[in-house]
Amino acid sequence: MEEKQEKSRIDRQFDFIREIDKEKFITRQTFLSDAKRRENDAEHAWHMAVMTLLLSEYANEEIDVLRVLSMLLIHDLVEIDAGDTYAYDEEGKQTQRVREVKAADRIYGILPEDQGEKLRELWEEFEEAQTPEVKFAHVMDNVQPAMLNDYTEGKDWIAKGVRLSQILERNAHTAEGSQKLWDYAYTNFIEPNVKTGKIKDDTK
């Protein structure tokens, strides 16, 4: 029996590149700006990457922008297997870590070992949320959907009955990455929708 030839480095790289095309099929809850359909993970990653290029000057601390961009582009790839966990899905969050670790093992494992380990480390760094780069990346991950929710007149917030307390809890650490951007997002994207009742104010 002929021994199976081990894949070359470039073969494994293209296997991974083809695999991550599946991220385009992972639907998130946030609607696009025309409010006609929900965005997918790849669109979300692209949007956050461009935001980072433009808004990194507002980070609380000096950050490595390339590292932030790298994290934002790869951290949701695990959702190809694990699926998207909605921000306010408390039941889904209970199994999220287990699902995503298993997905990370498979997906990053497609790559040559050195590159797979590098991307896996970036993903773990994002999950631990300790470094200045990750803190800023989380700002992007929270502000981008808030902006789109506001732009679509609170369509998803209304559909899900989202409460202000939920938003504040999710964003409890957003200001640690950028006080300026959190203040801007709250004033321009969240507070107006509280005033119009699109976000239920349960904090009083």
Predicted features and spans:
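Alpha-helical, largely C-terminal catalytic domains
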Residues: M1-K204
